[in-house]
């Protein structure tokens, strides 16, 4: 601060110059005139003097505090009134503190302001409690009659003691009530403290609890179940639900706050918002089940190999198995092709083998993949006269994916056009090399018709099984896999189960995916009932709650209640995931709906005999959809056609298709009465061809233009009635009346219209051939000039089909 005069300093501190000069003199500063300049050092000296003098005076004054209280109150009892005066006096002395030297800086220490107040309140309460003992009993009775007055005047003055006031029970009761009211009053005073007087006790706490803005974005690890609502997801990320909805709109999905989304979508949203997703599988019940069952304890014994026969359609897979079983399995299949997975247990002279016969048609891809999943060895059947086909290559891929060895059976070698060497060469292009060429694949030429080479093929299969050392525990709870399932009328759900380990008995509680039930009956592959089934044995199981999905694992559970809980848990989880994936408000679907007005749809109600065929048909029919026509399977199921299926078809204008199933008598009556299109099929080729024809009929018509004639304008005649008439020479083809035309000028189309009039020698004619003159009148067009060309064409409709 710059030096200033004494007068200026006096004006600054708001005092008189004379008073300031006196204080400077007391402080020992040599300044005698108001115009003299005072330095910073002299100011500090003056300030130190003032502090010392003021602190000494206040210490003397404030070292002792005397509090005096005087309260007047009137207590009424009937007609009498008593004046009560309460006087209290308290003296508080400040403790002596040693003064430190002036050279040392005095530490600043906060003294809580509420400590003295608290002591005062406590002492005042004690004083009031002692004074209450002198109040008369008449006052107590009046206070009982008027409790509201008691609340207003809770503290009573001292009175002369009477007999009634000496009673201990009433005295204690009055003392407790008044003491309680005193505390309430004190608490109310504290609670309603003015806003400009902050509580010193909480001052430091409020400073410490202030909100600190984060310096960096907070990255959280968000646990995501298999399905979650948008609101729960927002809560886990500590953001508003509107932010999550906005992020999903940027990703192309429109959702609501209560809509469920699947785990994959939630993980994408969490990553988009800068957090880390943690995927959680809600399979605690299943893990507990596996833990209770544990590993099967028992000695593993050799088991029969499970062999899957794969190959292209009509290459002789079922005929080969037919020869081995000595039965005509092929004759029972419609059209001579396999449309189910057949599981057969065969006892040969060399040992036992379980065969799985898979379909070869392209629609049964899922069945072949399922067959390769639960097999030990794959026998690839290739026709020697046909060679490698698409399903042959697909079977090789399934075998490699399942990591199972392949044995190639070259069939139909009894035909004169058979060429086994060509088969080896073609398979070598797919990395299937025979042993004689340095590979690891066994090749065996066979004939399913004559039986040639089949014994050698069985030897190779069992040799491969010995190399694999196939073993399984043959006792304890059974485990297996569902090969096929269907809904049988009269028997209910039927599942073909291939036992992989343990032993399955009648009465066991079987858990299969989302279905469960007690095994009511077991039927072997020969059609005979059996009571137990060991490893590598296929059996048909009756008694499940529904038709399980083919490919599900079957496991025996000791407790039916636990099986029911797990099945219901899986059903609920499946439903939640399915609903979460069904995004009805997805942006892409909105755009699809905008174009659906131009797309024709064929609605189908599909019923099949087994689950595998239903899957294959659904996939094959959905592949037929194009940009113009669409197959919409509104309902599908396993079992016969019922009235509910027909009613659904009536409501949705659909075609009912039954594959190897029929409708009962009441349903047929309903079909005839309502005129529903009901079709039966037993061969998948016929079904797909018929649906293709139906879709072809829904295609928009396509027209092809064909130029039939060309005329050149030589002259133009104008008439007030007719308009412009072009005198033309037909230079090419034939000109016919009422056909569409184009007017060309310098080879540029300037008008398209209709040929309205055609004359020759003032007579109307139907057509004019090449080299003939004629007059042509064009409808609603009069700007014809010499040198123009009139092109006459016709439109023909082209029959369109689905490729």
UniProtKB/Swiss-Prot annotation:
Skewed-composition ranges (Basic and acidic residues): 138-155, 168-178
Family (UniProt): Belongs to the TRAFAC class translation factor GTPase superfamily. Classic translation factor GTPase family. IF-2 subfamily.
Region feature (G1): 311-318
Residue ranges, compositional bias (Basic residues): 156-167
Record function comment: One of the essential components for the initiation of protein synthesis. Protects formylmethionyl-tRNA from spontaneous hydrolysis and promotes its binding to the 30S ribosomal subunits. Also involved in the hydrolysis of GTP during the formation of the 70S ribosomal complex.
Name of the protein this chain belongs to: Translation initiation factor IF-2
Pfam family, one: GTP_EFTU
Region spans: G5: 447-449
Stored HAMAP family: IF_2_B
Region entry G4, spans: 411-414
Classification via InterPro entries: DNA-bd_dom_put_sf, EF-G-like_DII, IF2_II, IF2_N, P-loop_NTPase, Small_GTP-bd, T_Tr_GTP-bd_dom, TF_IF2_bacterial-like
Annotated segments matching region Disordered: 95-125, 138-178
Region (G3): 357-360
Name of the coding gene: infB
């Amino acid at each position: 601060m710059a030096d200033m005069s004494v007068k200026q300093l006096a004006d600054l501190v708001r005092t008189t110059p004379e008073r300031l000069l006196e204080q400077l003199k007391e402080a020992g500063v040599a300044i005698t005139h108001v115009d003299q300049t005072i330095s910073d050092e002299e100011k500090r000296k003056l300030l130190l003097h003032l502090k010392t003098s003021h602190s000494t005076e206040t210490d003397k004054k404030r070292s002792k505090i005397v509090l005096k209280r005087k309260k007047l109150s009137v207590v009424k009892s009937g007609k009498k009134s008593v004046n009560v005066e309460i006087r209290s006096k308290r003296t508080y002395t400040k403790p002596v503190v040693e003064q430190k030297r002036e050279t040392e800086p005095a530490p600043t220490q906060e003294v809580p302001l509420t400590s003295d107040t608290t002591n005062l309140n406590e002492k005042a309460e004690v004083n009031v409690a002692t004074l209450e003992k002198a109040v008369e009993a008449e006052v107590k009775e009046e206070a009982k009659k008027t409790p509201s007055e008691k609340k207003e005047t809770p503290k009573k003055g001292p009175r002369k003691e009477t007999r009634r006031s000496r009673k201990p029970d009433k005295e204690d009761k009055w003392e407790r009530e008044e003491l309680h009211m005193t505390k309430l009053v004190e608490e109310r005073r504290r609670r309603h403290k003015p806003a400009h007087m902050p509580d010193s006790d909480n001052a430091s706490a409020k400073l410490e609890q202030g909100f600190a803005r984060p310096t960096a974005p907070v990255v959280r690890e968000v646990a995501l179940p298999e399905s979650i609502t948008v609101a729960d997801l927002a809560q886990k990320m500590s953001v508003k639900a509107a932010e999550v909805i906005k992020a999903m709109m940027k990703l192309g999905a429109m959702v609501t706050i209560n809509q469920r989304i699947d785990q994959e979508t939630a993980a994408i949203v969490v990553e988009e918002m800068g957090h880390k997703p943690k995927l959680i599988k809600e399979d605690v019940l299943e893990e507990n089940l596996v833990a209770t069952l544990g590993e099967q304890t028992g000695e593993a014994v050799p088991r029969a190999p499970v062999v899957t026969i794969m190959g292209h359609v009509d290459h002789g897979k079922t005929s080969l198995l037919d020869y081995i079983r000595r039965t005509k399995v092929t004759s029972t299949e419609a059209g001579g092709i396999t449309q189910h997975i057949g599981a057969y247990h065969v006892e040969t002279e060399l040992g036992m083998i379980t065969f799985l016969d898979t379909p070869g048609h392209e629609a049964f891809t899922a069945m072949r993949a399922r067959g390769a999943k639960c097999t030990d060895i794959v026998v690839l059947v290739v026709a020697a006269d046909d060679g490698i086909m698409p399903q042959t290559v697909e079977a090789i891929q399934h075998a490699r994916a399942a990591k199972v060895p392949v044995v190639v059976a070259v069939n139909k070698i009894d035909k004169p056009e058979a060429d086994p060497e060509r088969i080896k060469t073609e398979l070598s292009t797919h990395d299937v090399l025979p042993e004689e060429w340095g590979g690891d694949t066994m090749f065996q030429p066979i004939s399913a018709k004559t039986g040639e080479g089949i014994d050698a093929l069985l030897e190779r299969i069992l040799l491969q099984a010995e190399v694999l050392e196939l073993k399984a525990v043959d006792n304890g709870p059974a485990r297996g896999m569902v090969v096929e399932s269907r809904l049988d009328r009269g028997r209910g759900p039927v599942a073909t189960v291939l036992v992989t380990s343990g032993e399955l008995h009648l009465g066991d509680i079987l858990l299969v995916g989302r279905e469960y039930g007690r095994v009511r009956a077991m039927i072997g592959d020969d059609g005979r009932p059996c009571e137990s089934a060991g490893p590598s044995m296929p059996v048909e199981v009756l008694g499940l709650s529904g038709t399980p999905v083919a490919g599900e694992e079957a496991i025996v559970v000791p407790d039916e209640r636990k099986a029911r809980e797990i099945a219901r848990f899986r059903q609920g989880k499946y439903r939640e995931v399915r609903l979460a994936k069904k995004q009805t408000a997805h942006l892409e679907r909105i755009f699809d709906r905008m174009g659906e007005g131009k797309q024709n749809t064929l609605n189908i109600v599909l019923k099949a005999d087994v689950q595998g065929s239903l899957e294959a048909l659904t996939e094959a029919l959905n592949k037929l959809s194009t940009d113009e026509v669409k197959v919409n399977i509104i309902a599908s199921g396993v079992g016969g056609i019922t009235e509910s299926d027909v009613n659904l078809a009536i409501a949705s204008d659909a075609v009912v298709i039954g594959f190897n199933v029929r409708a009962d008598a009441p349903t047929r009556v309903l079909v005839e009465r309502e005129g529903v299109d009901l079709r039966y099929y037993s061969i998948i080729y016929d079904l797909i061809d018929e649906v293709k024809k139906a879709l072809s009929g829904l295609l928009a018509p396509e027209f092809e233009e064909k130029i039939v004639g060309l005329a050149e304008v030589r002259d133009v005649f104008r008439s007030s009635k007719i308009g412009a008439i072009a005198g033309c020479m037909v230079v090419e083809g034939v000109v016919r009346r009422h056909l569409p035309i184009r007017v060309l000028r310098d080879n540029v189309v300037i008008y398209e219209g209709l040929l309205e009039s055609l004359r020759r020698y003032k007579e109307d004619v139907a057509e004019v051939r090449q080299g003939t003159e004629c007059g042509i009148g064009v409808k609603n067009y009069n700007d014809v000039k010499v040198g123009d060309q009139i092109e006459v064409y016709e439109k023909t409709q082209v029959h369109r089909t689905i490729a």
